[in-house]
Structure formats: C-alpha cells, structure tokens
C-alpha cells in the first residue's frame, strides 16, 4: 500500500524540491534540502528533467545527513490522517535562494547559518590581554668628570678590581656596582687595543726596510759631494742618495784616498825589509798553455773618488765611518756599477 504523493513524487523527481514539508511520526516538521533547492531551481524550469530521481535523492541525503536516519516515505501517524499537502513548487525561501552553494570537502566543518564565521572567542581574549612586547632598551650611562677621574685612578691601580673594591668605588662615585663593572670591562678592551697599536708601530719603526729607506740629512751628504754644487745630480733634488750610491766625483780622489790609513801607495807603510814577490806570470818557467792565456784582463774601474777637501776636514770625528763608506763605494764600483743607473 502506497501513501498518496510519496511514490509518484519520487518517480518524477519532485521529491527533492525544497518546498516539501514532511511530518515525522512524532509530529515535528522537517525540511528537505537539495542542490536544486539551494540553487533556486524548480520543476517548472525544465532543468530537473535531466537529472534522474535516484541521483537527486542520493545528493540530498549526502548534503543533509539527517535524511539517512529518516525513511524515504514517512509513515502516516497512528490517527490515520494523511500527510499535509506539499507546498507550492515555486516557493523557495529567500535565505536559501540567495545563499551560494560550496562543495563540501572531506574533513571540513561547515558552519551553521546561525553562527558567525570568525576567530574564536578565546583567541580574541588572548589577543586583547597580551599586547605586543616592546624591546627593552637600556639607557646609556652618562659619567660626570668626577666619576671618570675616580674610575681612571682606580684603573691605574688595578685593571681587575675585586667585587669589594668595585662596591666601594660605586658608593664613592654614586653609581651601581654593575655599571662600574661594565666600565672596567670596556676600559680593559680599550687598553688592549692601545697596546696592540703601540706594539705594531714599534715593529714598523724597527724594520730594516724602513731604516734603509730613510735618507740621511742633507747636511751630512753635502760635504761628500752630493749637494747641488757637486755636479752629482740636478740642483734642488728632493731625495738625495746615499754617498756610495751616487756617481763618482771627478779628479782629486788620489789625495783623499792616500790621506786615509790603508789607502796609500804600495810601498808606503811597509817595512824596509819587505820585498815584493816576483811576478810569476811573467817568469820563464811558465808552460805554453799559461803563456797563451796572457795576463788577466783589466776590469774597468771608475775614476777615483775625489773631493775639493779631504774627508778628515769634513768629518773630524767620524773618519772611520767615512772609511767604511769609501770601501763600500769601491766594492760597488768593482762589481760593475749596478747602482749608477739610479
């Protein structure tokens, strides 16, 4: 036995419309929600004919899980009264017709129409109670002249004062002990930097390259002929060269060399009993190989060092230094004058 309006409605697809009001056995009224009802379509539009009845009923059950527990066709109540007549097919509630349809994903909770979508009440309370924390910035301590004077005096006595000394000093200069401790730490760091700078500057001053590059004063070089009047360079040269690096001076060097000890003629300063050895290269017993070689070639030597006045007059107390410089001069000239290009 079929109830009127139940099986025919399911057959022609009109069972899924939103306007049907069903009365449950308990007497409460329930409303069916389907995709067509949410979108606002009716049977008269002609769109519902393309969907089968089973598909529309299955989609309505998926959208509203309450339909799964209800029977497809509710039974009539015990009193034998029939179900109330269905409402007009074209009647669609306004809130359902304007609400868009969003597909429900798995694990996603759809909010109820009566609840507002937004952050939870607990989160809003926490955000109101906990304002954003500001970064704590310590104010810089400004020391007075008296405080700096007392701190410097204490630093001269000891770079690492103990806690008792710091507390006593803090009470004396009216500062917290923590500020005094921080000041000593900064002062020790500054002292270490100063020590490193002093050590590095002393090493640079004592290096041989810098001592060699330093030129002697012009007053000491002028008697040796390196001044503008000696003809060794252009007048007014900014960087005078050392005496053994300059070009030789013309003429008159023999008298200056003979005045120094050890630079006299070959026979001077020798005892009377000394006899020079015979020249073995010119002797007869030499073999033919040595005779073909002949005497050794004479290396070109620069003209003798000369000056208008003797070195003893220029350096009355530094004759030994002048002699050493002259020996170095002759040694460089004998090598081949490599420094004259300078």
From Swiss-Prot:
Chain segments carrying region Disordered: 44-140, 208-295
Keyword entries, A-Z: Developmental protein, DNA-binding, Homeobox, Nucleus, Transcription, Transcription regulation
Position of sequence motif Octapeptide motif: 33-40
Domain of life: Eukaryota
Low complexity bias spans: 208-225, 235-244
UniProt DNA-binding region: 136-195
UniProt biased composition (Basic and acidic residues): 55-66
Pfam families: Homeodomain, OAR
GO molecular function, one term: DNA-binding transcription activator activity, RNA polymerase II-specific
Iron in keyword set: no
SMART domains hit by this protein: HOX (SM00389)
An individual GO BP term: brain development
Subcellular location: Nucleus
InterPro entries referenced in this protein's UniProt entry, alphabetically: HD, Homeobox_CS, Homeodomain-like_sf, OAR_dom, RAX/RAX2
Main location (coarse class): nucleus
Intervals of motif OAR: 319-332
CDD domains: homeodomain
Protein's job: Plays a critical role in eye formation by regulating the initial specification of retinal cells and/or their subsequent proliferation. Binds to the photoreceptor conserved element-I (PCE-1/Ret 1) in the photoreceptor cell-specific arrestin promoter.
Protein known as: Retinal homeobox protein Rx
Source organism of this protein record: Mus musculus
Gene: Rax
């Amino acid at each position: 036995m079929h109830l009127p309006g139940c099986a025919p409605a399911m057959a022609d697809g009109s069972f899924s419309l939103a306007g049907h009001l069903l009365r449950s056995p308990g007497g409460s009224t329930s409303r069916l929600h389907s995709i067509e009802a949410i979108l606002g379509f009716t049977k008269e539009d002609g769109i519902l004919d393309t969907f089968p009845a089973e598909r529309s009923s299955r989609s309505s059950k998926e959208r509203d899980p309450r339909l799964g527990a209800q029977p497809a066709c509710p039974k009539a109540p015990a009193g034998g009264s029939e179900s109330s007549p269905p409402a007009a097919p074209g009647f669609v509630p306004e809130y359902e017709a304007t609400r868009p349809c969003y597909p429900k994903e798995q694990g996603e909770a759809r909010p109820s129409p009566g609840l507002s979508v937004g952050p939870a009440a607990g989160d809003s309370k926490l955000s109101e109670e906990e304002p954003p924390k500001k970064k704590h910035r310590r104010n810089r301590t400004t020391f007075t002249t008296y405080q700096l004077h007392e701190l410097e005096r204490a630093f001269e006595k000891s770079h690492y004062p103990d806690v008792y000394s710091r507390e006593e000093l803090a009470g004396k200069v009216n500062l917290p002990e923590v500020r005094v401790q921080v000041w000593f730490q900064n002062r020790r760091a500054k002292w270490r930097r100063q020590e490193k700078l002093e050590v590095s500057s002393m090493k640079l001053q004592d290096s041989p390259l810098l001592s060699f590059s330093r030129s002697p004063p012009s007053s000491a070089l002028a008697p040796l002929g390196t001044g503008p009047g000696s003809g060794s360079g252009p007048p007014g040269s900014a960087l005078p060269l050392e005496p053994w690096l300059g070009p030789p001076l013309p003429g008159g060097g023999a008298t200056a060399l003979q005045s120094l000890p050890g630079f006299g003629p070959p026979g001077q300063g020798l005892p009377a009993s000394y006899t020079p050895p015979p020249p073995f290269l010119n002797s007869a017993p030499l073999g033919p190989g040595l005779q073909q070689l002949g005497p050794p070639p004479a290396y070109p030597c620069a003209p003798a060092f000369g000056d208008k006045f003797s070195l003893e007059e220029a350096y009355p107390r530094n004759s030994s230094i002048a002699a050493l410089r002259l020996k170095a001069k002759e040694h460089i000239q004998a090598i081949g004058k490599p420094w004259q290009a300078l």
